[in-house]
């Protein structure tokens, strides 16, 4: 018979008792009452925070948005097809955040900052909250440095500064994305990090933008955040905030950033869908009451930091799509009131072959000439006024049979000025080339040419100036002013090229 050794048993028990760690883990849990259409109703989750992440039994993550007396309304970050009624849900105690690092440059991500370009995982040691507060008044300074878009019409008449928020607004298929991608391409060598956020777009459109950026060598300083049209509404709603968090990471590291939201109409629609399914009361155009706050808290994150924070900047170019030119709809008026100006793209101008189809008359930059180099201010001062007068005259001239000489010459000048603002896609111009273009038009050098020859002449003049008068570009780049020496060089180049052009 085996003898029982009491001392051994007591020692073992004593060791076990000493090792016992009375750690109680309290988990805030709930039960799924109902699920469908990307929304789940949860019973329980008594101490959940608004905006807290919750995890379902089968792994789907959701955000608690509606905290009601009897249940919690959760929006899902996935399709939720495997979630069953009665399954358990636990609160994570975390708010949505994403990893951030330099390694994200050149990559295509989704709204959760996970790569979707098939090039492997991205290593990151830091993380940022998707929704973080905008910089306060003290930490900002006024916009004073230009952000060149490479488009003559914008840089000369609707200048954008670093830290500004400039809305690009227009109907579908008017070239809004083209203006944005051209601006990204023009940041090459300017030490600006770009973030392009595609919200609810076709996958083919996003692929086209990525290809354009790769061909232009712009992907090395660009991050693309994309949530396609078939993505859950929650992710389409989150994508712009993810883009803003990535841009902020670089801004607070004393760098300049440019972020494009393409487009905020789709984000508002995704948010409307979520709100209606959560049974929040609808307001104007069935949007929820806080749709203004949806966009204002996003766009207020764009800023120009003061010197104590390192003078970094985040420039935002939100895009909004209008329905048949109706700028007075709910979302367009909201975003116009939040931003520092708008670039209005017109379908009529686009169809008339004027591209970029910018309606200069109703486009405006509220930062104004503070965001222009001195050289551009010197040359482009009269351009907007002359074009506005021309548009008015042109409308009047349709009814007049015989016009006096002065009116005819003003109309002829206006047509040529409109012609010089035309620019092909993915062909941004340097500041020097823009100054040359505007000067040639406003000083009347193009008046003797046929309208069809204007762009040919300007192309030839750019080449001539680059090869024979390189000092011109050097003066503009180094001094940022249109000096007398630069003007003499430009006049010589124009006359030489004009003689050569007329002989052809």
UniProtKB/Swiss-Prot annotation:
InterPro entries hit by this protein: ATP_synth_asu-like_sf (IPR023366), ATP_synth_asu_C (IPR000793), ATP_synth_asu_C_sf (IPR038376), ATP_synth_F1_a_nt-bd_dom (IPR033732), ATP_synth_F1_asu (IPR005294), ATPase_a/bsu_AS (IPR020003), ATPase_F1/V1/A1_a/bsu_N (IPR004100), ATPase_F1/V1/A1_a/bsu_N_sf (IPR036121)
Chain positions recorded as ATP binding sites: 170-177
EC number: 7.1.2.2
Localization of this protein: Plastid, Chloroplast thylakoid membrane
Topology class, membrane: Peripheral membrane protein
Assigned GO CC terms: chloroplast thylakoid membrane; proton-transporting ATP synthase complex
Keywords assigned by UniProt, alphabetized: ATP synthesis, ATP-binding, CF(1), Chloroplast, Hydrogen ion transport, Ion transport, Membrane, Nucleotide-binding, Plastid, Thylakoid, Translocase, Transport
EC supergroup of this enzyme: translocase
Site residues, Required for activity: 363
Pfam families: ATP-synt_ab, ATP-synt_ab_C, ATP-synt_ab_N
Family annotation (HAMAP family): ATP_synth_alpha_bact
Its biological purpose: Produces ATP from ADP in the presence of a proton gradient across the membrane. The alpha chain is a regulatory subunit.
Family membership noted in the UniProt record: Belongs to the ATPase alpha/beta chains family.
The name this protein goes by in its record: ATP synthase subunit alpha, chloroplastic
Organism: Jasminum nudiflorum (Winter jasmine)
